[in-house]
Amino acid sequence: MLPFYAQWVLESYDKAISPLLVSLLGLFSIASVLFVPKNRRFGVGFFIGMLWFYWISLGLRYFDMSFLIPLVVIACGIFMGFVFYIGLWCECLIVRFAFLLLLSYLTPFGFDWIVPESVFAYSYIGVDKLSFALSILALWILFKYKTWWKLGGVICLVFALDFGLKDSKIQNLPPLKIKLAQSAVSQDFDYRMREAKSIFSEHISDIQKAINEEYDVIILPESAFYVPLDSQYFPYFDSLLEMSHKIVIIVGALREEIHTDGRASYFNSTYKFDKGKVSFYDKVHLVPFGETLPSFLLPLVNTFFQGIGGFSAGKDFGYFDIAEIKFKNAICYEGSNRGFYADYPQYVIVTSNNAWFVPSIEPILQKNLMKYYARLYGSVIFHATNLSPAAIITPFVSSR
């Protein structure tokens, strides 16, 4: 956890964290799990769970369920406490080694952010499983053995370093001038409905400003236009079509689909406006307990609470073609999902709305996971955000 919190503090002062510092803090974090006494394993897991995932509860603020926040935070702690209690039952190398290597495969209800390797995302240490295994082995040898055996730990650590980290990001970027919008819109529903006209107008102004500054592409955040674009609440559709002759517009919006029986399905979508034509991709990988719910919980939740789990999932991930360059589209949570990167996309567009979870460590965790996957799969990620810093994330160790 230490690299995440250090990065959070430094970035709040617009300071980049040193890869060397991340490397050292990452090794310390892994060591704190590797060598935890078995009689303290539940307590350590409990506090790690709370510090790592307390932010999950913050979205409840917008559904009049703030009273549940402490319970959810404690539940996160208890869950990770039991995981540590079961996984760290023995203080031997083979058990601790296997636990740390396999922890990233733990995905409760599809939630796949339990990735200990991500502590090395901005470090000099490799993020693949082999490098992680060598780091664990190095720590074990350095702390458990004496005299010349420690040399073996140093050798393991040297081989865990990523020597392919030459920072050639300039040559790796597409030949397009891309504007990443960074908005600051509260998630409060009353505010969003009351100020919709001014918020949407500001987004249109941002697009016009990007045109004036001669950008080729502008990417706006997830749900920047949080109503269906063909609804009476959105008078700017024709303006977007007209502006798209001067700039390619990528923007998040709500999409409504009416079925033959009159039922409506709602999708979290990304639209592309280009030369007067419109295309879109729906979000495929929905957020557990936010945009989707396990089927056994639906009757209970629909009885007491409205507005949670109301989105439908899209069918497939897709690529936007911009000036004959392919960009794979991801919406928020998808950009930190391993399955999304399975085809090794060269360029990725990620749009996010982090208003649900700020102020918290969530944007830092998201950024580190995207950096982790960028390094693992060689992708360049263009991340446009609401209420967190926008960024170009490369496969190289740098401030990005």
UniProtKB/Swiss-Prot annotation:
Pfam families: CN_hydrolase. Its main location: membrane. GO terms for molecular function: N-acyltransferase activity. Pathway: Protein modification; lipoprotein biosynthesis (N-acyl transfer). It is a multi-pass membrane protein. The active site is at 222 (proton acceptor), 283, 332 (nucleophile). Its EC number is 2.3.1.269. Disulfide bonds: none annotated. Keywords: Acyltransferase, Cell inner membrane, Cell membrane, Membrane, Transferase, Transmembrane, Transmembrane helix. Gene3D superfamilies: Carbon-nitrogen hydrolase. It is found in: Cell inner membrane. Residues 181-400 form the CN hydrolase domain. GO terms for biological process: lipoprotein biosynthetic process. The chain crosses the membrane at residues 16-36, 42-62, 67-87, 97-117, 123-143, 377-397. Belongs to the CN hydrolase family. Apolipoprotein N-acyltransferase subfamily. Catalyzes the phospholipid dependent N-acylation of the N-terminal cysteine of apolipoprotein, the last step in lipoprotein maturation. HAMAP family: Lnt (MF_01148). This is Apolipoprotein N-acyltransferase. It comes from Helicobacter hepaticus (strain ATCC 51449 / 3B1). The gene is lnt.
